[in-house]
Amino acid sequence: MDKCSVGGLELTEQTPALLGNMAMATSLMDIGDSFGHPACPLVSRSRNSPVEDDDDVVFIESIQPPSVSAPAIADQRNFILASSKNEKPQGNYSVIPPPSRDLASQKGNISETIVIDDEEDIETNGGAEKNSSCFIEWGLPGTKNKTKDLDFSTSSLSRSKTKTGVRPFNPGRMNVAGDLFQNGEFATHHSPDSWISQSASFPRNQKQPGVDSLSPVALLRKQNFQPTAQQQLTNPAKITCANCKKPLQKGQTAYQRKGSAHLFCCTTCLSSFSHKRTQNTRSVICKKFASTKKADVVLPVESSRSFQEFCSTSCVSPCENNRNLKKGVFNKSRCTICSKLAEIRHEVSVNNVTHKLCSNHCFNKYRLANGLIMNCCEHCGEYMPSKSTGNNILVIGGQQKRFCCQSCINEYKQMMETKSKKLTASENRKRNAVREENEKQFCGLSSTLLKKIDGITEKKEKTSELHLSVECGTDTLLIKENVNLPPSSASAIADTFQEQLEEKNFEDSIVPVVLSADPGTWPRILNIKQRDTLVENVPPQVRNFNFPKDNTGRKFSETYYTRILPNGEKTTRSWLLYSTSKDSVFCLYCRLFGEGKNQLKNENGCKDWQHLSHILSKHEESEMHINNSVKYSKLKSDLKKNKAIDAAERRLYENEKNDGALLLYT
């Protein structure tokens, strides 16, 4: 029996009977002769590390094994087709199929199943890919390698990647003659990406460069499939199902509804996602449920990025009204001057303390109290940004007063004229009353003097006729003393009495008003005239004085008269007075207009030198001090106006008097 050894294969004359096909044996013999030496095996075996599977969509074909009627197969002389599970072919790999006559019966028994495998890395050694071996053994009865049943492995057949009706490219399948075989017939290669599903793309199995295969398949023409540049640059992004949020694996079929951007893993998720129950939202005002499909009214919430939903426009109006009320309450604040809760129009920051003023009137009071020099109209108090805005200046009593417009000047003039008329009428009435009283007193005094003079003359005539006697010596002496007054001196006596009376009245009005500059000597309660004189004539501050020390060794210093502002500017505290008699300090504004038992406004003053700086800073920022300073400034301005009016009246009176004298002489 002739034997031909090809690598690990032994071919005998009985081999055709075993295979049942002489043509297949002949072709195998030719392939064996082409190598020429047993050292060149038919199939290369590699015992290196395995190569993991791809995570492709694998289409598994369930094929019934063909029935072979040869007696050799009945005697368990079988043809074995084995393939490793971890097989990765290099280039165009080949699988020897059953005879063509059996393939026709297999087409009707093919079923399709989608399997998703996990992707594993390919282990390499020295840059060369290591492949598992796929070999064919044919043995005779009684030999070392026994025959086995025909084994169609699912893992080996799954690599064929065939699908009925789609006709994808099936790399490496060939017939015995060496031609490419596809789906049971001879066909040419299709595009390498024609088998990829629409939902995902998979990397192709390519042969690593530099690795040579010793299999007969390596002698065939090889096709290297290179991925495109776009596939090399872009990395696959993680995509999840829109319904169940499960990640879609590589190669998994995804479902998408037309016109929608959502992807789903299965039809169940697709149908359940489209029929989800709409979320109901509760209206903010009426607390009714409103479906999100309806055209709800959505408004943003203040001071946040959230939104509020309303069932209709009727619920929006009460919400807006509440917002407006809250805005109005928040915008209102308490005025520093009048202490009213109103809308603030002016804000003044002094020493990092913001004073809020509700109106122009309160602003003018605050401005006068703190000595703020601003461009404001004297009549309406409107602020003028620059001095060049208004050229309406009125000079009254040597002082320039600015106005915003001509109408304010006219109104101010009318107001001053009415005040002057009222003052002149009252002054005339007062003067007339004083004159009448003086005339009455003078008339009464003159009548009494005349009566005395008449009685004296009558007595003189009687005494001239009588003789002198001792009994009436005293009477005659008295009469002589009275008679010694000349009758022409009556008018002089009346004039001197009038002068003395006027001086007495003047002293009565002046003596209690005159006060010393020491606030410690002032009475506890000041009357109106005393307060006016102190406002007109401000007491001087004590300087260049040797201030005494107290028990702790502390004393008053002139540095307390100066206040340092936050910007470094220095201002004088003109309201702070030092009493040498009581060794204490007083607040002039609070001493004149204040009430209560504050240290700086009572009759004893403040002498806490250790905490004086803190007391002064706290006191000058208090509301009581600011109000008293406003009253002081207002009274001072009123007294100046009255003086100006009195001076004008005197000038008018003198002019009228001079005019009357001139008329008399003409």
Curated annotation (Swiss-Prot):
Keywords: Isopeptide bond, Metal-binding, Nucleus, Repeat, Transcription, Transcription regulation, Ubl conjugation, Zinc, Zinc-finger. GO terms for cellular component: nucleus. There is a cross-link at K85, K88, K146, K163, K222, K440, K452, K459, K549 (Glycyl lysine isopeptide (Lys-Gly) (interchain with G-Cter in SUMO2)). InterPro entries: TRASH_dom, Znf_MYM, ZnF_MYMT-QRICH1. SUPFAM superfamilies: Glucocorticoid receptor-like (DNA-binding domain) (SSF57716). Signal peptide: none annotated. Functions as a transcriptional regulator. Interacts (via N-terminal 120 amino acid region) with ETV5 (via C-terminal). This is Zinc finger MYM-type protein 5. It comes from Macaca fascicularis (Crab-eating macaque). The gene is ZMYM5.
